[in-house]
Design a protein with these regions (language model features):
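Active-site-proximal loop/turn and secondary-structure-junction residues that shape catalytic pockets
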Residues: 19-21, 44-46, 79-82, 121-125, ...
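Histidine-acidic metal/acid-base catalytic patches
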Residues: 1-36, 63, 67, 113, ...
Length: 241
């Protein structure tokens, strides 16, 4: 009798509202309830969530919207690619406001009962030395990981595509950053689009970090670019026994 392969269970999946930016948060949550999902990765940007460097807002409203539908927020994802805050901000005022923004994200995640907040390395200026930018990103990750630990959370760090960052864009970059920060509150996360663009596989990530180290991923297909429905792209999802 052949051994059955592991299957992905619906309760393992946290749906994400970034795909519903043109709809209200109520509409998104209604759809997730109807589809039978149980948990949410909350992307924090308007028109769904108000979060900035001055604080977080309407946490009670957000919590009630999920609870009324039998849903829970499992991960919080503060927008930082198209918004003015990023993890490797160089200018002092930008750095100060970015760190404040992400700390408020951690606080909101705690209030909403999340287990994790998803992060990335940010990016250095293209005209500065990469290692100098790397040091700054590492310092900021260390500050935020410590703050996350104080609030009962773990940060999960994904890689980015080369046009999004000149820092962590590969599994080896992610391994280096996480090893150098050396905090139990900073853990790896796989983004399958960045993984596919880098020509990597899930096996590469599991081999780099070991069994049980990866608890979260952005699970999407691509060609290798794009954010496609699973099966519409070409990402390698085969895992050896």
């Amino acid at each position: 009798m052949s051994e059955s392969k592991p299957t992905l269970r619906r309760e393992q999946i946290a749906s994400m509202n970034i795909h519903y930016i043109m709809w209200s948060l109520d509409y998104f949550l209604d759809v997730q309830q109807r589809l039978g999902f149980e948990s949410i990765e909350l992307w924090c940007a308007e028109p769904h969530v108000t979060l900035d460097h001055t604080g977080y807002f309407e946490a009670e409203v957000l919590a009630k919207k999920a609870a009324d539908r039998g849903l829970r927020y499992r991960t919080l994802c503060p927008e930082n690619v198209v918004y003015p805050w990023q993890y490797c901000a160089r200018k002092p005022l930008h750095e100060q406001r970015s760190l404040a923004y992400f700390k408020h994200g951690i606080e909101l995640a705690e209030v909403l009962g999340c287990d994790r907040m998803s992060v990335n390395s940010g990016w250095g200026d293209w005209d500065e030395d990469r290692e100098e930018a790397w040091k700054r990103s590492r310092e900021h990750m260390s500050i935020l990981a410590e703050y996350a630990g104080e609030h009962g959370l773990v940060l999960t760090m994904e890689s980015l595509r080369p046009e999004e960052s000149n820092l962590v864009t590969t599994v080896s970059d992610a391994k280096r950053m996480i090893d150098e920060v050396a905090s139990p509150y900073l853990q790896p996360m796989v983004d399958t689009t960045a993984m596919g663009v880098a020509g990597e596989t899930l096996e590469d990530w599991f081999a780099a970090f070991g069994d049980g180290a990866i608890h979260e991923m952005h699970f999407i297909d691509g060609d290798p670019y794009g954010h496609l429905v699973w099966g519409d792209g070409k990402h390698d999802m085969e895992i050896s026994d």
